[in-house]
């Protein structure tokens, strides 16, 4: 956030007469106490609350100040100092005391294209400087084209009021609806991306008025004016342009182009044959020592235009109605965008529902197949289980039979074992008998042998 001098401006400057006022600003003449030099003090009413529409926001004030701090050009007003108090930010600006260019020209009996273009060239030079710094003024109109001093042979143009000027950043799309309806470009009316080209349209309108005293798009109402601008509804009425050169008309045509990309740039405008031809004619006239032939334009209609413009300034050229209109357009654009977003969301939701339905149907078919397969598997398992249970019962019966058989075998084995033991005892007894018999026989045999020997 920029910081300004938190001092009372009247400690440094003596305030004088009011020079002009706008919706949220008052400009007063002032004199610096130390030097006696005269300046213009622009009191900008600060917005107290962000939700309020009274006053200028801090962001807007800082934007204007930052732009003024950056620019230094003979045809652009200069910022000298800045003060701030509780209610206002005060810009101390170069004093531009020569009045409006159109008022100055309207005081003349007649005007030549050459004279008009000398001033136009200064306007182009100032805008060229701004555009070289990517600064768009966005409010070029007769009231903001002033003379530093009209009481000199060659008055100097000064472009003033940078309240809605913007720095155009590459890659950052900028849209807004502001400016003075009579001079705004179609892209502003239609809420389209804005750039330096909008200033060139305004220069086209200013040139048209300068040469004819008529406004190309001005209607009975603001809505009619904006409709004419959007439709690029204008022509070169012979009543107003009978003394205007074709080159001048071509210059205007190349600026009043709806497509910003096809509109003449500031560099191209400075190289346009109409601007360069006047310079060449002036040089030839100086070399030959005679004045070049000049087309003279009546200033009667320009007088009428300036009188009408000043008298209708409060109701017709104030920003209030146009701002309300712009708010309506912004809200309508936001509503349309919201509707488009809702339609996109509805379409996406419908697509999601269809996708989910397709997934559900696919899953349902898969579950159905799986269910059928599982049913078959369950039936097969049930059959296997029944078989297993039957085999189990058979095995149990066989085991029971085997147990019964084992008990019988045990009893039979026991009986056989008993019989075996009895037989073993009997055999043992008989074996002892035989052994005793054999021993007895052997003794008898021995006894017989002994008897024979004797």
Swiss-Prot record:
Pfam families: Pkinase. The phosphorylation status is critical for kinase activity, oligomerization and intracellular localization. Phosphorylation at Thr-180, Thr-225 and Thr-265 is essential for activity. The phosphorylated form is localized in the cytoplasm promoted by phosphorylation at Thr-299; nuclear translocation or retention is maximal when it is not phosphorylated. Phosphorylation increases the trimeric form, and its dephosphorylation favors a kinase-inactive monomeric form. Both isoform 1 and isoform 2 can undergo autophosphorylation. GO terms for cellular component: centrosome; chromosome, centromeric region; cilium; cytoplasm; cytosol; intracellular membrane-bounded organelle; midbody; nucleoplasm. Belongs to the protein kinase superfamily. CAMK Ser/Thr protein kinase family. DAP kinase subfamily. The active site is at residue 139. Widely expressed. Isoform 1 and isoform 2 are expressed in the bladder smooth muscle. A sequential activation is proposed: autophosphorylation at consensus sites is leading to dimerization of the catalytic domain stabilized by phosphorylation at Ser-50 and activation segment exchange (producing an active confirmation of both kinase modules in trans) followed by phosphorylation at Thr-180 in the activation segment and at other regulatory sites. Phosphorylation at Thr-180, Thr-225 and Thr-265 is essential for activity. Oligomerization is required for full enzymatic activity. Inhibited by pyridone-6 (K00225), a potent, ATP-competitive inhibitor. Disulfide bonds: none annotated. Changing residue 299 to D: Predominantly cytoplasmic localization; phosphomimetic. The modification Phosphothreonine is found at residues 180, 225, 265, 299, 306. Homooligomer in its kinase-active form (homotrimers and homodimers are reported); monomeric in its kinase-inactive form. Homodimerization is required for activation segment autophosphorylation. Isoform 1 and isoform 2 interact with myosin and PPP1R12A; interaction of isoform 1 with PPP1R12A is inhibited by RhoA dominant negative form. Interacts with NLK, DAXX, STAT3, RHOD (GTP-bound form) and TCP10L. Interacts with PAWR; the interaction is reported conflictingly: according to PubMed:17953487 does not interact with PAWR. Interacts with ULK1; may be a substrate of ULK1. GO terms for molecular function: ATP binding; cAMP response element binding protein binding; identical protein binding; leucine zipper domain binding; protein homodimerization activity; protein kinase activity; protein serine kinase activity; protein serine/threonine kinase activity. Keywords: Activator, Apoptosis, ATP-binding, Centromere, Chromatin regulator, Chromosome, Cytoplasm, Cytoskeleton, Kinase, Nucleotide-binding, Nucleus, Phosphoprotein, Serine/threonine-protein kinase, Transcription, Transcription regulation, Transferase, Translation regulation, Tumor suppressor. ATP binds at residues 19-27, 42. Serine/threonine kinase which is involved in the regulation of apoptosis, autophagy, transcription, translation and actin cytoskeleton reorganization. Involved in the regulation of smooth muscle contraction. Regulates both type I (caspase-dependent) apoptotic and type II (caspase-independent) autophagic cell deaths signal, depending on the cellular setting. Involved in regulation of starvation-induced autophagy. Regulates myosin phosphorylation in both smooth muscle and non-muscle cells. Signal peptide: none annotated. Pyridone 6 binds at residues 94, 96. This is Death-associated protein kinase 3. One of its GO terms (biological process) is regulation of apoptotic process. It is an enzyme of class 2 (transferase). It is found in: Nucleus; Nucleus, PML body; Cytoplasm, Cytoskeleton, Microtubule organizing center, Centrosome; Chromosome, Centromere. Residues 13-275 form the Protein kinase domain.
